[in-house]
Amino acid sequence: ALSQQTAANHFDLVRFVPYSMPSLNIDMIDCHVDLFDHRFKWPVYINAMTGGTNKALEINTLLAKLAQACDLAIASGSLSAAIKDPSTKESFQTLRKHHPQGFIFANIGLSYDALGAQKAIDILHANALQVHLNAPQEIAMPEGDKDFTQWGKNLQSILSTVKVPVIVKEVGFGMSKETIHSLVNVGVNTIDVSGTGGTNFIQIENQRAGGGIQGLENYGFSTVESLLEAKNLDVCVLASGGVRNAYDVVKCLALGAKMVGLSRFFLDVVVEYPLEEAILRTKQFLTDIKHLMVILQCQTIADLTKKPLLFDPLLLSFLHQRQQ
């Protein structure tokens, strides 16, 4: 999965207007975010990745220790495996074991109703629940669920029953304004647009025997396009999908994201380096966000949302067509 990144991410098509006379220093920068009745120290979180195997136990333990050391929120991979096979629970519960006071998102798909969602929350003593939308992935998987007739009913069941905040997230195909409107209409108030540019599940399935849909590798909206789609809609927006570095994070925040999720960056750092080095590199990444805010003359996240942005003609064309 680490190499499956063929669809566009578009972050390089967004530019800030430079400002050459900043009057801030790093100690003046306030990166905190208030969300879900919680104050997050940083506007980034470790997004959903893995669980259910011995390797996942090892990786999730490292990610949880990293989150603990850097005061970051973290999301689990889909807890479907743990619900179906309780013997795999430990590979998920290591998140709470090693990040006992941390903010943890459980993750479940819409093949589950409120009962399954609550099981997922209980396994992690989770602070919030990600409900993922992955129809293209399911269609492309030979063993995937091809019947989505219960998705709407299950989502309404979850929204009306669970007591923790619910985030409806894509899994790398982005969200259109039509999707967002339909979610808001059933009571969703927080989304993670999760656009193209990160892990490409269609490409992964296309490389499996008997799976995939050829030609669908570039299906979806990029994270940037999805953030533009969500502009001025009555919903709290989180961003993920192909976010590579601190500069991409800052661009997401400027485009209106409340927080930004990264998977690849954090997975790479814990796989490639000893934990202490991974912690140092993560702290440098977080410091880079503040450094970028200094040169942009932005003391808070709210200041970033007021910065003028320049778009490449490709994005201007997208905006023009989507405003018709």
Predicted stretch roles:
Residues A1-F36, F40, L314-L315, H320-Q323:
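An N-cap/entry alpha-helix motif that binds or orients negatively charged groups
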Residues A1-L2, F266-Q324:
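C-terminal extensions of enzymes
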Residues D34-A81:
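Active-site cofactor/substrate anionic-group-binding motifs, chiefly glycine-
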Residues D34-H38, L62-A69, F92-P100, Q118-H125, ...:
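Acidic (Asp/Glu)-rich catalytic clusters
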Residues V44-N47, L72-G77, F103-I108, V131, ...:
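Hydrophobic faces of well-ordered beta-strands that scaffold small-molecule active sites
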Residues I46, A67, L129, I191, ...:
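Conserved, mostly hydrophobic/aromatic
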Residues K55-L57, S80-K97, S111-G116, Q137-S160, ...:
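Active-site-adjacent beta->alpha loops and helix N-cap segments on the catalytic face
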Residues Q150-E272:
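Glycine-rich phosphate/ribose-binding loops and adjacent secondary-structure elements
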